[in-house]
Amino acid sequence: MLEKFCNSTFWNSSFLDSPEADLPLCFEQTVLVWIPLGYLWLLAPWQLLHVYKSRTKRSSTTKLYLAKQVFVGFLLILAAIELALVLTEDSGQATVPAVRYTNPSLYLGTWLLVLLIQYSRQWCVQKNSWFLSLFWILSILCGTFQFQTLIRTLLQGDNSNLAYSCLFFISYGFQILILIFSAFSENNESSNNPSSIASFLSSITYSWYDSIILKGYKRPLTLEDVWEVDEEMKTKTLVSKFETHMKRELQKARRALQRRQEKSSQQNSGARLPGLNKNQSQSQDALVLEDVEKKKKKSGTKKDVPKSWLMKALFKTFYMVLLKSFLLKLVNDIFTFVSPQLLKLLISFASDRDTYLWIGYLCAILLFTAALIQSFCLQCYFQLCFKLGVKVRTAIMASVYKKALTLSNLARKEYTVGETVNLMSVDAQKLMDVTNFMHMLWSSVLQIVLSIFFLWRELGPSVLAGVGVMVLVIPINAILSTKSKTIQVKNMKNKDKRLKIMNEILSGIKILKYFAWEPSFRDQVQNLRKKELKNLLAFSQLQCVVIFVFQLTPVLVSVVTFSVYVLVDSNNILDAQKAFTSITLFNILRFPLSMLPMMISSMLQASVSTERLEKYLGGDDLDTSAIRHDCNFDKAMQFSEASFTWEHDSEATVRDVNLDIMAGQLVAVIGPVGSGKSSLISAMLGEMENVHGHITIKGTTAYVPQQSWIQNGTIKDNILFGTEFNEKRYQQVLEACALLPDLEMLPGGDLAEIGEKGINLSGGQKQRISLARATYQNLDIYLLDDPLSAVDAHVGKHIFNKVLGPNGLLKGKTRLLVTHSMHFLPQVDEIVVLGNGTIVEKGSYSALLAKKGEFAKNLKTFLRHTGPEEEATVHDGSEEEDDDYGLISSVEEIPEDAASITMRRENSFRRTLSRSSRSNGRHLKSLRNSLKTRNVNSLKEDEELVKGQKLIKKEFIETGKVKFSIYLEYLQAIGLFSIFFIILAFVMNSVAFIGSNLWLSAWTSDSKIFNSTDYPASQRDMRVGVYGALGLAQGIFVFIAHFWSAFGFVHASNILHKQLLNNILRAPMRFFDTTPTGRIVNRFAGDISTVDDTLPQSLRSWITCFLGIISTLVMICMATPVFTIIVIPLGIIYVSVQMFYVSTSRQLRRLDSVTRSPIYSHFSETVSGLPVIRAFEHQQRFLKHNEVRIDTNQKCVFSWITSNRWLAIRLELVGNLTVFFSALMMVIYRDTLSGDTVGFVLSNALNITQTLNWLVRMTSEIETNIVAVERITEYTKVENEAPWVTDKRPPPDWPSKGKIQFNNYQVRYRPELDLVLRGITCDIGSMEKIGVVGRTGAGKSSLTNCLFRILEAAGGQIIIDGVDIASIGLHDLREKLTIIPQDPILFSGSLRMNLDPFNNYSDEEIWKALELAHLKSFVASLQLGLSHEVTEAGGNLSIGQRQLLCLGRALLRKSKILVLDEATAAVDLETDNLIQTTIQNEFAHCTVITIAHRLHTIMDSDKVMVLDNGKIIECGSPEELLQIPGPFYFMAKEAGIENVNSTKF
């Protein structure tokens, strides 16, 4: 039929059976024309429908678009001309075949359709159509056959169809031009990402990414260089899609759970399921409280959670991406098995000299084409999968964050902040990782089945022997993996312990330096590190066995298979076709067999993460239904029979509260510890579980928590808290909250970076910023949970007057104030006394006193136990009937000019205190003006900060290539001798690899010499034996290389860790002041972990890949020396691609790390401050911040993923060209090459693509991971403090007297800063008791630090008992002094270790010290006594007990000099008295220097030293100084000590 249609032969095999084969013209004009046209017409409706549904606006007409339309217009004209020519010919005598009418007519319709599609896509602002690009490629490929046929015809002198041929050539040229234009992208200024407008060819080759690669090569990339992600990748878009499915699937899972529970309940004879309450949502069963074990014992059951819904939700969200990637992977897998078949044809071609040459060329072209299609499909598949992984991670991270904002307290109690952060980081990452390779599950099975099928065709049943070996290896690997996992778990525990100690060391480094305890703690860390390295070595040695088995498996498989094949039947002779085709198939089989168990393991790990995420995301939300907001309510707040609890099964914490609070009232809530004061506020915020009753609130709420929550940012940002800046209001708030003097001190003022959790601020400063934040918001109701607890009494008074009180900024607002301060109660409108969660009393101050109930009783007790500062203000009511009056006056009476006192006490105590009111007024005015200027010119101010004024130094991030010296340093740590033997073993492995391939080639050549009947058994056995021996040699040399390297790498890890630890412990204190602890811990955690695990693996892989590529190229060049000419340009391309990629990839990895940390920090910060965020209703703002952070990280991750694809496609092209040119050489030189040589060369060439790719990745990995060594080295070069011990040592009994002399002593914190002590000169006699006082920043603590040489002298000297302390070792000095610091820092370990880490004292001495420290009875009551374990930072002891333990340390050391650095500032009155009494008795014969916080603690001193601005401005006995109206006199007066002359303490 088609022959009539064409009027010529449609098909005849004889056309191909000739040296110059060709296809029949009819076939070319029908089938090869209709294939591309059919593709276009079939898919065009779908394409146009997609365009029709698109809502994108029309774009402007571009030159590129016009050019393509014009060229298609020319094609249309050419088709019309051809049709006209046909009609002209047909009018003559000759009969024109139907095909000559049909084709131009079809083309006319097709070009019109193309014009329509191009126009519609331009109208929709779509990128160039991949659909049209594929059509042009298909049309050009199909047209190639007709093109060469017409050329041949013309060359043969047949010009009968000259006009038609010319039209075809012109049309063909225009199609090529259109395809070239299609490779370019339309300019679209609205797009932030070129990938969204990239053409089809640009997309599959990733050439749109060239500009980033070029930029990254020229200079280090910055965040601004990296493009934003598409809208479809944005967090907001992904979460919106995912949440829709998540809610639906979660509801289904909850209903299914409810049905199961109901069914179970019915089966249990209607027994009620514990934990299930009709008033609760079913997801409540997902909750497990902290005391779950106790409740399990009670109920004997475990609560269920909705399960198996997360994966369904993810699948429904991203199923289209999964479908696309599935199709691409399927095509890739099919084409994987094309290469071995083409290899077989090429070997056959080389073996048979009679085969036509064109068959060889066709096979070479098909081999290249198959490899190219495989590469494009594989890289597109990976791009889709990795993008999907990022999308899944983003959706999970954003959902976990959003859930954290709504999760109930009951559900939240299960998770620490760290565990919740882990859900975002670790669990989301595991789901991302498994998503990247999830198709490998079915793909591995498919590849295994197809491999065995094709192997069976080559070798028959013999293949089962090889497969059997592979199957046997799987359980061996499983056993080895299990053992490896056990070692890893053990090692992780050791690592956790080491990092825990390191964290404690760094947190308490000052204590370690004060007590010279560094060696003891260094030894603890080193001992744990030894265990860690021992496990690491054991793990590495086990990995050597794993690698040995892995290396030996393919050799063993091929040896066993080939041996069985030649042994089972004497007719079976191994020829080149069978051997090398089988080797290629075995190489394909290796990958899925190794990947399948890994994938199953990864899936199991991911399932654990899925369960954890399901439990968290399926947890109950906060139920705020009991909190009713009514804007028309007549009261500000009303509690109606309100009872609330923290846990469902526990008793109510707030019970049956009935309370009305009117608008504008100031209500104080008081009561003993545990009475429910904070719980009352939490109930109002909706943070507790409602038992019954409700709370009605009118208006918006602000909340100041007891433990202040500060964000990592500037002070100004913390106060504004996302609201608009109002200069006037802002200044009022700063002054009212007593923050102006603090801002004067802080570098940068209100623009000062205050660090994570307000690390650079005192507790009082943090509390005042927290209060300022609430005050600035100007809301209706203020819930204040003991905001004055962390501030000085006088600062508290100032804040009460200026902010909280009747005349404060918040007057007219409704205020609920929880407080322990009795002084302010007379000024409140109403007092609510709580006891055991209920209201015991309520009423006005005078009314409650008149009742003489619980409140009046507590007030009397308070006044009896108040310190001297308060006692001095008590009205002397001697008569019984004056009791109530005395109570009132004693609380109401306050010192004059509270604002002045506050400012002087906190920051601005000047020598001219006699003119305090006037001077302070002027000072505050100037300070306000300066702050106003600072706010207006904030940017300028920030830029002009004095050098050295930054509190925390920004972490230095290396850019560009890592210096060679870093590599050299690491190699020296491994050991040059070890490196030599490691490389030698790897080289010998490569030699054995080349030898085994050459031997196999020789073995297959036997088939030409011998036939099946006369093949000698001895020859056969020798071939099998030597081949097996060479394979075994490969395994042995790899084992030796890995085994030796294990020792070398562990040795390097040990050296680097030891250097880092020693140097950090010897670093001066200023290093720790300017470097966040987390940054140092990261060196001991992340960087050491990289040096332990990742870097060694990368180095081994790099050496293996490098030698593998060299081996392959050597073998190819040995077979065909002319191939060397091809290797050189390919090598240049390869090296160039590598250089460009590594520079970019390295910086993108750094950017990924830099942008990932803020996500987790922000999340951790959010979880810590949830009640505040929810109270201010700022959830949406924080969600937006989270989205911005995730998107910032996403663009770095996406860019890094794309850089990998950019690299892979180019390397695979180099690899494919290597295979193509190898095949081409085999065809060209087939007369000089045998089939076994061809098989030998091509089977190795087929492996080179993957190895080339892996080598560049390993190069990049090494460059990325060597940064860890760079970072460690940076800290090993930190300047050290003075030597611990020197040759000049003091006498053993030094100091015997305790006499201290300061001679013009000067000191500064850092070289670039001003002096903090300016010429201190004084003599402290033996056994003198010295009190040191002064304002904040006067230099009191600096004086202490100088004694211990924490700060080194900038001038002058300190002499103790005749010895200049600068002339002796630090430990010789510090071991002879004792300090009781302000913060009682303990370390995890036994009580004994905390008292005596060096075991220098006997048990009797320690018990004696504990007795004197008033701790003996407490320690004796403990089950383990001195061995009792102290938790991290002493968390299981009270602050008082911790401070008494510090006293115990001091008592043990029996030093002649004792320093008390505000040691009782943070303890209660009882503990304070205990410490003071013990010091007076036990250190009577010592020199005692007390840095005073409470003046009464130094009133019995021999001398008082008053410091200001780093100088001694007064010095003398307390009695003398109180006679003179000087600084000390005014300080005593401010403290409320009125009768200064007669006061005796």
Curated annotation (Swiss-Prot):
Occurrences of domain ABC transmembrane type-1 (ranges): 322-605, 979-1264
Binding positions for ATP 1 per the UniProt entry: 671-678
Outcome of mutating residue 353 to H: Altered transporter activity
Ranges facing Cytoplasmic side: 49-68, 115-126, 187-313, 382-437, 483-544, 609-971, 1055-1097, 1141-1211, 1256-1545
UniProt-reported outcome of changing residue 1254 to F: Fails to transport methotrexate and leukotriene C4. Does not affect estradiol glucuronide transport
Pfam family, one: TMD0_ABC
Family the UniProt entry places it in: Belongs to the ABC transporter superfamily. ABCC family. Conjugate transporter (TC 3.A.1.208) subfamily.
Protein name: ATP-binding cassette sub-family C member 2
Organism: Homo sapiens (Human)
Gene this chain is encoded by: ABCC2
